[in-house]
Design a protein with these regions (language model features):
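ATP-dependent carboxylate-amine ligase
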Residues: 1-142
Length: 142
């Protein structure tokens, strides 16, 4: 199952609430973190302090099997996940959101969460369509 989850980038409370919601859901989960404020990508802010007010620790769970950090903030997300105690082997990186799809294991039975920012909605829907294609192809191959 693919779940779209808008996580307002640069807003610690909004992201924390989404992470807590994901934690509360039963079953194994794979996450694609692409919560990037694309509107300021050309004049990118050097202030990622909101990430340190965000409860990434909610994602430090045995139920979360893979976290793929994608987009211009991929390395910032990786660092924050490591500081939250999430094992490095669960974290994968891709600067391109479509390339990030190749890093998801897509284990049968796992729910896949796409977490995206407000102005990244059109991109998130295009990524979701590619993900659906990958899932259908994987189903057909089995």
């Amino acid at each position: 199952k693919v779940i779209m989850q808008m996580s307002k980038d640069k807003n610690a409370l909004a992201c924390s609430r989404n992470f807590d919601y994901i934690r509360s859901k039963p079953g194994k989960k794979e996450l694609l973190l692409m919560m990037n404020c694309l509107g300021v990508a050309k004049s990118w802010s050097e202030n990622p302090s909101w990430m340190y007010d965000t409860d990434f620790e909610f994602l430090n769970s045995d139920d979360v099997t893979c976290l793929v950090c994608a987009g211009p903030r991929a390395y910032d997300y990786q660092l924050r996940l490591l500081l939250a105690g999430i094992p490095r082997q669960k974290i994968r990186l891709a600067e391109d959101e479509f390339a990030a799809l190749e890093l998801l294991p897509l284990t049968p039975g796992d729910d896949v969460y796409l977490l995206y920012g407000v102005d990244g909605t059109p991109l998130a829907f295009r990524v979701r369509e590619k993900l659906k294609e990958k899932l259908l192809a994987k189903e057909g191959a089995q």
